[in-house]
Amino acid sequence: MSEIYAVNESFFKMILSRHSLGAKHLVIPAPDVGALRLAVTAACRVPCHQETLPFRWVEISSRDRLADLFESVLPADADEEMRAKARGKALKAPMCMALVGTGLSPDSQDRDADERLMTAGASLMNFLAGLHAQGFAAKAVSA
């Protein structure tokens, strides 16, 4: 074990024990306002050379509308099982948060867009780690 690990053992234990847990396995209680505030604060402590955060965190209040969105991006020939699975991403978990990016494009050839995308990804990791440190499980999903 390295000397650095020994000094920061609790940090490494927390990071190394974090794993994604799907919506069907998440249970109540969901994080309260204080827990969310702490996780979002951690999520905003990410490298961004432009000193502006190219994202925002939003608590989803209408899970049915989110389920509609997840279903709407499926191919036209998606079967009922695929539709139910897509909708379940929004409906099964005790709560849903959205990481909304500005000026992000994974297909861009623009260096600034790449940096904004990496900053948003770092924010997501800090958010998940912040929830895990408080005893909450979570998983990132996309539409």
Model feature map: region roles:
Residues 1-93:
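N-terminal amphipathic, basic helical "cap/leader" segment at the start of enzyme domains
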Residues 43, 104-143:
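Small-aliphatic-rich amphipathic alpha-helix that forms the alpha element of a beta-alpha
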Residues 64-66, 102-106:
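A short acidic, glycine/proline-enriched capping/turn motif at secondary-structure boundaries
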Residues 93-95, 134:
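Generic beta-strand structural signal
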